[in-house]
């Protein structure tokens, strides 16, 4: 679950440091992962991805984060860094990114980037500007949709997901953005091949990541706890809102 990934900065504690600290009071080892991956797991367990073996989760928020579910499992890669779609380079964009690179998707499609390009202070002002027909705001949103579609198209060529699940404040503020993203994504796919990739909204609220984290923490010694949503000997669990972690776990068994 990302435990092999190390940041190059000394500003963050290592897993060893965190383990020593937490074991002063608790027995189990800590499990470290990011909010986007836990939100993707929640969607796989109880949300929009509950009947899908493979999907890409993308969150457009203060940053741009991604996660891949393939064959009913979260994909972490060799060091837990797989799915960093927000830091794929887009076209001729040369804007500096907080990660240290230039031209990342995050510099076009995150809330701060969109607000900066549109000349507004926050997402509320951005929505008002777009709805009022402000050219600068609309251009910024269109540029973001095209960039997101480009990145998702490239990712789709690699893993052939059943769907793209998009989440975050930007999608909440502009529901029609999903169709713009889908159109841009399909332009990147091979036209002579038959593709069936839906771009859908996330169905769980902001507590989804916390619920999935609790689910994982309750199963620290189960190797398959990170499996997305394929119960042993059965079909994927039913879709629906994660109103209760305990109720869902009782109904569906372990993933």
Pin down the residues of each PLM region:
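ATP-binding/phosphotransfer module of carbohydrate and carboxylate kinases, centering on a glycine-rich
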Residues: 20, 24-26, 46, 51-52, ...
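Short secondary-structure boundary segments
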Residues: 34, 60, 168-169
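Short, active-site-adjacent cap segments at secondary-structure transitions
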Residues: 1, 37-40, 65-66, 75, ...
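Short loop-beta-helix segment that forms the pyridoxal 5′-phosphate
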Residues: 28-33
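Conserved phosphate-binding catalytic cores of ATP/NTP-utilizing and phosphoryl-transfer enzymes
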Residues: 34-55
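Glycine-rich phosphate-binding loop of actin/hexokinase-like ATP-binding domains
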Residues: 52-108
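Short beta-strand-loop/turn "lid" adjacent to the catalytic site in phosphate-handling enzymes
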Residues: 1-13, 163, 168-170
């Amino acid at each position: 679950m990302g435990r092999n990934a190390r940041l190059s900065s000394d500003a963050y504690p290592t897993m060893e440091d965190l383990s020593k600290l937490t074991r002063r009071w608790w027995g189990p080892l800590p499990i470290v992962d990011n909010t986007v991956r836990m939100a993707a797991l929640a969607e796989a367990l109880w949300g929009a991805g509950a009947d899908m073996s493979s999907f890409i989760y993308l969150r457009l928020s203060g940053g741009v984060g991604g996660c891949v579910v393939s064959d009913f499992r979260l994909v972490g890669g060799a060091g837990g860094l797989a799915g960093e779609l927000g830091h794929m380079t887009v076209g001729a964009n040369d804007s500096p990114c907080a990660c240290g690179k230039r031209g990342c998707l995050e510099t076009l499609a995150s809330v701060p980037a969109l607000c900066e390009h549109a000349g507004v202070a926050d997402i509320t002002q951005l929505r008002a500007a777009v709805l009022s027909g402000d050219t600068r705001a609309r251009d910024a949103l269109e540029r973001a949709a095209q960039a997101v579609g480009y990145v998702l198209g490239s990712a789709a060529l690699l893993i052939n997901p059943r769907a793209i699940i998009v989440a975050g404040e930007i999608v909440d503020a502009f529901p029609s953005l999903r169709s713009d993203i889908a159109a841009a994504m399909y332009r990147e796919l091979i036209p002579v091949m038959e593709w069936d990739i839906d771009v859908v909204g996330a169905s769980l609220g902001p507590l989804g990541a916390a619920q999935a984290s609790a689910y994982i923490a309750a199963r620290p010694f189960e190797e398959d706890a990170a499996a997305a949503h394929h119960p042993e000997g059965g079909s994927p669990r039913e879709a629906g809102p994660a109103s209760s972690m305990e109720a869902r776990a009782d109904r569906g068994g372990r993933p």
